[in-house]
């Protein structure tokens, strides 16, 4: 396999924990040595953010195992009852606190912009985060190239804002941003054909092949399923055409919104990621073609 230059991490809520297992396998096989940038949407954006600001996969595995994800919820009555005006029942305040803690723990200024990050941490991979610009009904890329003066934590907060659950974030121009998964949960789609050739994408069967029946157990999964249904038909062809560059993770009946997941359930997700990556690397398309010399 040609060493990839970038990783594209899809959204998927709690399923995003499986990305860590897949990345661990790629790292163990030496496939992350040439990575220059990480692209992420929603949960994938949060993980990409963590990696770029300096967290190792080992640190993330430990952090995720002990972290209580229910702590990111901020369901205060006054916020919930203002839903009509704020467009969400959770203002994302705890998410923002989490981003601040993550940045501070790695010695990264909490108010750092994409431009400042590229200048201060030039040796780190670049970061491209995707959210949905509701005001323009389009996908928004936050990056050094497109939004140099935007805060990293603003971009991540925008990308993880599940519509109607978390309030959207607003920029100086008045544009509102929500979860990038509303338009496309997998940033691999945003790349040119040449870029895709040097990219490994990681996503989930649960959100790429909707003809595989999945039981919907709560309102959050319902919202996510509605969003995924909107772009499934146009995406199916791309997944098949670029299967040699995409790791598909099977997560069985795991819920994307199970914030109360036990350490065993988290471990199972990360192991699912490892299994998918191992299968991907032994597939025929991952093996280099043998060259023969004329006698």
Residue ranges of each PLM-predicted region?
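Patatin-like phospholipase
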Residues: 1-41, 49-295
């Amino acid at each position: 396999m040609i060493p990839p230059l970038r990783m594209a991490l899809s959204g998927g809520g709690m399923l995003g924990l499986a990305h860590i297992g897949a990345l661990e396998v790629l790292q163990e096989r030496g496939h992350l040595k040439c990575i220059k940038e990480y692209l992420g949407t929603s949960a994938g954006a949060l993980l990409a953010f963590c990696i770029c600001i300096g967290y190792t996969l080992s640190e993330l595995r430990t952090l995720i195992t002990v972290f209580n994800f229910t702590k990111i919820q901020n369901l205060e009555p006054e916020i919930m009852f203002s839903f009509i005006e704020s467009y969400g029942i959770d203002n994302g305040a705890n998410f923002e606190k989490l981003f601040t803690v993550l940045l501070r723990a790695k010695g990264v200024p909490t108010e750092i912009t994409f431009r400042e990050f590229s200048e201060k941490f030039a040796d780190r991979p670049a970061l491209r985060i995707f959210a949905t610009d509701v005001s323009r009904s389009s996908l928004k890329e936050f990056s050094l190239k497109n939004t140099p003066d935007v805060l990293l934590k603003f971009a991540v907060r925008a990308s993880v804002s599940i519509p109607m659950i978390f309030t959207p974030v607003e920029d100086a121009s008045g544009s509102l941003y929500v979860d990038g998964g509303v338009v496309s949960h997998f940033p691999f789609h945003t790349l040119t054909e040449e870029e895709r050739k040097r990219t490994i994408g990681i996503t989930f069967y649960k959100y790429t092949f909707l003809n595989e029946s999945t039981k919907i157990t709560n309102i959050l999964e319902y919202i996510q399923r509605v969003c995924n249904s909107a772009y499934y038909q146009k995406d199916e062809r791309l997944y098949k055409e670029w299967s040699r560059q995409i790791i598909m993770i099977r997560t069985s009946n795991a819920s994307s919104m199970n914030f109360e997941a036990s350490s065993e359930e988290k471990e199972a997700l990360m192991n699912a990621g490892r299994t998918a990556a191992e299968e991907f690397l032994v597939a025929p398309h991952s093996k280099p073609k043998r060259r023969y010399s004329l006698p």
